Amino acid sequence: MTPDHNETVPATLTVHLDRPLGKINPFIYGTNIEHLENLIYGGLWGELLDRRKFAGHDGGRLPNRGRRRDRGLAGPWRGEFTDEANFGLVAPWEPVNPTDQVFFVHDNTTFYSGSQSQRIDLLAADDDYHGIGQDGLEIATGTDYVARVVLQIEGAIDSVVLRLRDAKGENGRWNLLPDGPAGDFTSYEGTIRSERSGPASFELVARGQGRLWVGAVSLMRADVAADGGLRSDIGAKIVASGLKMLRWPGGNFASDYFWMEGIGPLDRRPTRLNRAWNEYEPNDVGTHEFLDYCERLGMAPFVCVNTGSGSVEDAAAWVEYCNGPSDSEWGRVRAGNGREQPWNVHYWSLGNEIWGDFQVGHVDPETYAQRALEFAAAMKAADPSIHLTAVGHVRNVLGRWNELVASAVSGQVDAIAVHYYNLNPAVLAEEPPVQDKWDALVAGPKSTAAVLRDTIEIIDRHWSADLLPEISYDEWGIREDLRWAPGWKELYLLRDGLNTAGTLQEIQRLSGRISMSHQFGFVNRLGLLDANPNQINETPCYQGFRLIAAHSEAIALETESAGPTFDTAGLATEPPLEAVPYLDAIGTLSEDGARMAVSVVNRHRYDAINAKIVISGGSTAATTATVHELNGTDALAHNTYDDQRQTWIETREQELNVNSGTIEYVFPAHSATVLELPIDA
């Protein structure tokens, strides 16, 4: 692209009402909810405390203290002959008011959850409180927090306090009366009301002489806890975005996830080191939490089973747990956990990216195909009505993966999965020039479409059943290089929002074959939203997704774009492209034929484009249109928690310039627009 400022160049868009490309399955508007970094824990899930069930190493063995950064890895001893003050304390917990009369043990003999508790020995009574705490919390003013702790107490402990502290001192407390029976774990729940906002720490401290075992502890905003722990404010953004399907629990995480550990009482569920991401999984968000959340939001669940380290029997049992009647073996267990009626989960995936050598349970294509057939048979025996997706790859790489898998599972599964991301700049030695990155990303949907078409052709060629498989494009997005990203989080710009909108337009063009697609992932890492415990920030990618998903109609139409083009040089994993249209457009038509939406991405960083919109095979007498426009203060604008008016979607009614049945419309530079129009009967 040439940086010519403030020019207006001409183009022509032709929308063919009489050339449908296919009916758009609403499940192309999906996203991934994976247990990865702070997508769920620290994002969707309202728990504020890390390592709340005290699994893992003590502080003396961690090279990386901090919230969710150590990823479960043991480090070298810091001191071979001297214990540090945090020895025996599970990281990231720290001692509060330590003395030589306070002793910490990660106790593997007496525990409540999993195989470990946190023990605090107060060897002598004094007037001070001693115990454990962790920092890194963000607290809101005048907010109630529900605190819950599971304790076993021995000896003369006369007072237990759970409190918040900040730079000014105490910021709310709950004085717990430890009246449980001696020798047993007892669960206590109370409320802490904060007085100030800002960074804070949480402390659990006791006074007296004796011993405390802390089996589990929790701190959650009261409004979030009342909603079941998964945040309603993020849920509202999910609904508003036009999303229709949530894929869970992964992603790579699924290849080492054991669903039976994620049911039953929260504090009893064990913590496991998930090998996919080397992160401790507390199992607080399990089957009930996810499926109830989907039900509450009106989302279809898409559940990925563990074909990496899991068994056929576990997968079949999971189907029965979700879908079986309450008098079936696993239906009775479900009912015992509080859910009498089945959820009737229809969409299931037979693993995730098992072709990758990074994946737990990685195998060759023929072995996976056999494994997929075994899983499919067992799961269909539990519920013959379910829809199954097998793991595919792009084109026919990795030992002819798609060829061998498609030919083996043909007719036994319903869909083949494809994953493909734009850019993946980790192969670059340094951050590329701004214009090169702009070109690669705004044109990225074109390279995506080429990969998808090539992949579909290969799968179809080796599929022997009469009915061709559906394609589930169930991971896509923009891989930003975190070496240059602030806070180990991708910084998505308006440029990336145009990529997101353009990718959905390409998926709509392939609606005859793609039945599901899932952007990765919704919150924080690779997310459409940024979220901390008290705030949400809409990225331009969220706005680009919402623009298309919330305002498109049901049938994709053949649409042509004639006008100025540009070439790209290629960048990272993006190939060089020639003659990429500045205007990318697709029309969609309502099922009754009464309404049309024309969505248009102007990829030009600097210039507006004056387009003539020709409606072929029909007409509109409209003189005004409802316009939804994504734009920003500049081409590289982005929102922050404190300033969310740098990019936006503006909705307005606008008069149209109609000349001889052709609509003229000026699409601003670096924008994405949807025009909603009535169609003449």
Predicted regions mapped to residue ranges:
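Noncatalytic carbohydrate-binding groove/subsite architecture in carbohydrate-active enzymes
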Residues: S194, A200-L204, G208-R211, D364-T503, ...
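Aromatic/acidic polysaccharide-binding cleft in carbohydrate-active enzymes
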Residues: F27, H35-L36, L468-D584, G593-A594
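Active-site groove signature of glycoside hydrolases
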Residues: V205-R207, P249-G250, E329-V363, H419-V427, ...
